[in-house]
Amino acid sequence: MKLNGLQYTDGARHSKKRLGRGTSSGLGKTAGKGHKGQNARTGGGVRPGFEGGQTPIFRRLPKVGFTNLTTKKYVLLNLSDLEKLGLNEINHQTLVAKKVLKNEKELIKILGNGTISKSVNVKVNKVSQTAKTAIEKAGGKVEVI
């Protein structure tokens, strides 16, 4: 089997409807639109969300909440994640190299879930109090940048 020999299974694809190509085609003259009426006209039909004049659902439901434009998204790493990485130094460059971060502009926060056994030097944007004490107890250093 080669890529240039691939074919669709028989009956897997329908042929395109050719509209308005003579009455014997079955889709000539009115081209499947019927006679007159809103949907027979050019640009005919109702807009999305129109419910026949009834107040549409998007107007019946209340507005809720807002999007905070100044919020900061942090990449969350637990102590168990740091243990799995097996690095002596945790910073933006090492995490990008290990493909934990996409780029160096991402913000990092270390959380205290799990345990850490060896000393690690951590240089991140935020650290929880439990994570900080656990890292320092294991002989590591924490620097918030």
Swiss-Prot record:
Gene3D superfamilies: 3.100.10.10
GO biological process: translation
Record's keyword terms, sorted: Ribonucleoprotein, Ribosomal protein, RNA-binding, rRNA-binding
Record region (Disordered): 1-54
Bias (Gly residues) ranges: 42-52
Family to which the UniProt record says this protein belongs: Belongs to the universal ribosomal protein uL15 family.
Task of the protein: Binds to the 23S rRNA.
Protein name as annotated: Large ribosomal subunit protein uL15
Organism: Spiroplasma kunkelii
Gene: rplO
